[in-house]
Amino acid sequence: MSWGRLSRLLKPALLCGALAVPGLAGTMCASRDDWRCARSMHEFAAKDIDGHMVCLDKYRGCVCIVTNVASQUGKTDVNYTQLVDLHARYAECGLRILAFPCNQFGRQEPGSNQEIKEFAAGYNVRFDMYSKICVNGDDAHPLWKWMKVQPKGRGMLGNAIKWNFTKFLIDKNGCVVKRYGPMEEPQVIEKDLPCYL
């Protein structure tokens, strides 16, 4: 086995192992500058809503919907309601939903992570909530930088996220297979799920 192949295989394990070492998590995962080299979502890490670093390798073998969320958007109710419904119906089939709060659009997610968690509990959210992040600009989370430049993750009129509730469908190998704009409700993703679950 070549060194290059071995290092690619070990990289997710090394990144996850680094999470236990204080100070290394930020430099090796969450604020990595080498996001362009990633081949799948599984090579990234993010802080969950409670502030714990999570290696996204845990989603290997699952189909994922990754979305930016906001609690004060006109599309909040329909998106949370439909995401909860999709998760309830397809979680046993291997669907996972990753929700990333973001305050970049109309300042519609101003609360703390604890306030966001309490808000989501009002919808009986059982899918994975992550800490508030930026999805655009230099401070964007590396996962979001990566998803936006993938061949099937590019947007219309540029790759920037346009608003709350932009959604990415990720296959079992951690690759972006489709991007859905903020005006597309989660139920439209359902027709695409059978191809990947």
From Swiss-Prot:
**What would you give as a GO molecular function for this chain, any one?**
selenium binding
Q: Quote the cellular component terms of the Gene Ontology held in the record.
A: cytosol; mitochondrion; nuclear envelope; nucleolus; nucleus; protein-containing complex
Q: Which terms under GO biological process does the entry name?
A: apoptotic process; arachidonate metabolic process; cerebellum development; chromatin organization; dendrite development; lipoxygenase pathway; multicellular organism growth; negative regulation of ferroptosis
Q: Give the keywords, sorted.
A: Cytoplasm, Developmental protein, Lipid metabolism, Mitochondrion, Nucleus, Oxidoreductase, Peroxidase, Phosphoprotein, Selenocysteine, Transit peptide
Active-site positions, per UniProt? U73
What tissues harbor this protein?
A: Present primarily in testis. Expressed in flagella of epididymal sperm. Isoform Cytoplasmic: Highly expressed in testis. Present in spermatogonia, spermatocyte and spermatid (at protein level).
Q: Record keywords: Endoplasmic reticulum included? A: no
Where are the Phosphoserine residues found in this chain? S40
Q: State the protein's purpose.
A: Essential antioxidant peroxidase that directly reduces phospholipid hydroperoxide even if they are incorporated in membranes and lipoproteins. Can also reduce fatty acid hydroperoxide, cholesterol hydroperoxide and thymine hydroperoxide. Plays a key role in protecting cells from oxidative damage by preventing membrane lipid peroxidation. Required to prevent cells from ferroptosis, a non-apoptotic cell death resulting from an iron-dependent accumulation of lipid reactive oxygen species.
- Protein family per UniProt: Belongs to the glutathione peroxidase family.
Summary of subunit composition and partner proteins? Monomer. Has a tendency to form higher mass oligomers. Interacts with FUNDC1; this interaction promotes GPX4 recruitment into mitochondria through TOM/TIM complex where it is degraded by mitophagy.
Q: Spell out the protein name for this chain.
A: Phospholipid hydroperoxide glutathione peroxidase
| Source species of the chain | Rattus norvegicus (Rat)
What is the primary gene name for this protein?
Gpx4
